């Protein structure tokens, strides 16, 4: 019979004990959440919607979207990614780090929402910091922004709500 342990367990049982990063064991969970009313003109191809600032050293646990039907047809697609900001201008670091060309905004989604955290992201990156999710070689410090980029336009105004859960040391 095999007994296999995660790194968290192996670190705890090691002699001397090895500390695991707080973002993966006993970290502080935080939440960013909100709602934005989107006009039909906010859903054009190449438009962006910034959801929330997240500390660059945080580890994203979950990104859930809840929305009205934002597309009366079947054209709306969007990415969920990471952006930096300078003087009010947002620059994509990885515009589809979490989700790529999702179609979830084409129909209303309530209830438990749609978790898009691993739609494009590999599950083995759980516990990785936001700056690493963005493909950066070092932590820029401060905040990075989680945002949506519309690849193909929607045409229906409505509300978009989000809940982003993340862990900090």
Where are these regions (language model features)?
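Surface-exposed, low-hydrophobicity beta-strand/loop segments enriched in small/polar/acidic residues
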Residues: 2-169
């Amino acid at each position: 019979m095999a007994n296999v342990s995660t790194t968290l367990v192996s670190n705890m049982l090691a002699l001397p004990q090895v500390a695991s990063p707080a973002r993966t064991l006993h970290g502080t969970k935080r939440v960013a959440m909100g709602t934005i009313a989107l006009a039909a003109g906010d859903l054009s191809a190449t438009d962006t919607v910034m959801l929330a600032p997240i500390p660059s050293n945080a580890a994203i646990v979950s990104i859930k979207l809840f929305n009205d039907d934002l597309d009366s047809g079947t054209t709306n697609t969007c990415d969920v990614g990471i952006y930096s900001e300078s003087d009010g201008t947002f620059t994509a670091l990885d515009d589809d780090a979490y989700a790529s060309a999702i179609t979830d905004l084409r129909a209303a989604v309530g209830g438990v929402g749609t978790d898009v955290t691993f739609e494009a992201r590999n599950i083995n990156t759980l516990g990785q910091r936001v700056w690493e999710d963005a493909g950066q070689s070092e932590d820029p410090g401060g905040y990075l922004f989680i945002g949506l980029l519309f690849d193909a336009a929607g045409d229906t105004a409505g509300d978009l709500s989000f809940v982003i859960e993340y862990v900090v040391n």
